[in-house]
Amino acid sequence: MLKIALFDIWLSNEDRTFNNYNLLLQAIKGGFSILYIIDNTEIFNSSMAYDQSMELITQDDSILNSKLATFVFKNDTETVREMNDLLKEFPIFTKNCQDNLQSILNQVPQKWHIDLQSHKTKIDIIFTEDWLKICEHTFRKYIQTSIIHKP
């Protein structure tokens, strides 16, 4: 779930929020579960549709601010370790995405009516060093205030 939260911060996904997870949990044999990510129609930040800059999702809109996150992340020490491990991999994940960007964009359904070419500049922003640093800082902050030190 931490990967999903970081992904949402990176893309500024406003569609998955503390009260609209857009996730399905399926129980499988052996007491395990599979988490499915669903409903990605509104994954792109609403500022993408307008002549605005990319904006981070708010802490209130982050899945890290959900009851589900509070339930899943009970062990502060383990959560911090997982966060640090994930952030070490974050540049690799984003580079992999950038390397495969055209293939990924080709999979965006036509029915979403997104003119990807007109959003190229904003899409390119998510790969900049500044944006990645902002996302890392925001992710750490949201974990600290929404999970570790939640009132």
Where are these regions (language model features)?
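Conserved kinase catalytic-core segment
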Residues: 1-49
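C-terminal catalytic region of ATP-dependent kinase domains
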Residues: 30-151
